[in-house]
Amino acid sequence: MASSKLREPVDEVFDLDLAVPETTRLDSSLHKARAQLLVKGRRHRPSRSRLRDSTSSAEDGEGSDGPGGKVTDGCGSPLHRLRSPLHSGPGSPAGGSFCLEPPGLRRSLDEDEPPPSPLARYRPLHNAASHEGLAATSGSPPRSAPSSDSSPSFVRRYPRAEPHSEDDSRDASPPEPASPTIGLDKKTRRKFLDLGVTLRRASTSKSRKEKGSNRLSMGSRESVEGSGRTGGSPFLPFSWFTDSGKGSASSGSTTSPTCSPKHEGFSPKKSASQESTLSDDSTPPSSSPKIPGDPRQETKCSYPYHTLSQSSDEFLDESLPAVEHWTSQQVGQWLHSLNLEQYAAEFAARQVDGPQLLQLDGSKLKSLGLSNSHDRALVKRKLKELAAAAEKERKAQEKTARQREKLRRREHEAKKS
């Protein structure tokens, strides 16, 4: 009885072994192969001279390789086909792997590597394409495929590229996709880059100058071109941007004020600080109306941004006509510029001048014959613009007067010292 009781637990143990059979260990060879691949990826790229020697030796030994040679493109196990999707593209062969290197060069590079481990079935993972895919996930620097400069076709086709040093291959610029007919050296690339920077700077300065040229009328520009002055206008665009400059200037020429060529000539007395300070406060809206002038006042301009091209002495020595100093004739010309010439006779009969024009409201405009609400709204809007421009002009004159006073004080102190 006792012996039978002792046999039962022993039998139960053997029964458990039968119920749960022994299994083989998990295959961790793929992870080991990946770890070895990452370690190999930290090697530096071979130099051009070494690649050239290995290529020549590979070409010599290409015909002597028999069936006993080293096989690098074999893809034996189905596990590799399942776990490496980088080689299963439709363009690649069924059993081979995709690589950018020629077969002779790849064979010579494999000869420098240590002897293969027992995991020979994972050998096809050691090419450039799968290495880049695996190394990108782990963050280690991948061993990139040799560029077109190091390929044997490039060496045979361009023998002058051999004297380049090894530092050229490690240039900071990214490798360009080379074609068999196009090969740009570093100097040519630098010239193209400098040309791009020059054009970019020219385009920005052109856009700034076009903003100023939009405020000039076509009549004043024609008078500048006809005058034949040696000092050109600072608002003229570049020669290769002439068409766009003319187009933008013609769009804003109907509403911009006129000015004589005297105010558009560049004066060498103008300092850069005065030009920058005047350009901040003296920029009226681009839709400002045309300011008419009688024959005695054609050489004067009412807006202060025309003084950017003249000296501060000329700006203060001349009395610029503002809206408050308009005569009834100038008011009539202003109405003609707004296409409201049918009301010019009534304004001339009432002797409406500049100060009276600024005081007009809706009821006064109705009494002057502007029965159309659209015309009244147009006149009111233009009057607001005139008042704002006059206020800006007054502030600019005050600021320029203060600047001139400061300059005189500095010159006086400099003379004393």
Curated annotation (Swiss-Prot):
PROSITE patterns: SAM_DOMAIN
Biased composition, class Basic and acidic residues, residue ranges: 159-173
Region (Disordered): 37-306, 390-417
Top-level division of the source organism's lineage: Eukaryota
Designated name of the protein: Sterile alpha motif domain-containing protein 14
GO MF annotations in UniProt: actin filament binding
Modified-residue entries (Phosphothreonine), positions: 283
Ranges of biased composition (kind: Basic residues): 40-49
Any one GO CC term of the record: dendrite
GO term, biological process aspect, one: calcium-mediated signaling
Cited SUPFAM superfamilies: SAM/Pointed domain
Modified residues (Phosphoserine): 84, 108, 173, 179, 279
Every SAM domain range: 326-389
Keywords, in A-Z order: Coiled coil, Phosphoprotein
Coiled-coil stretches noted in the UniProt entry, renumbered to this chain: 375-416
Comp. bias intervals (Low complexity): 138-153, 244-260, 276-289
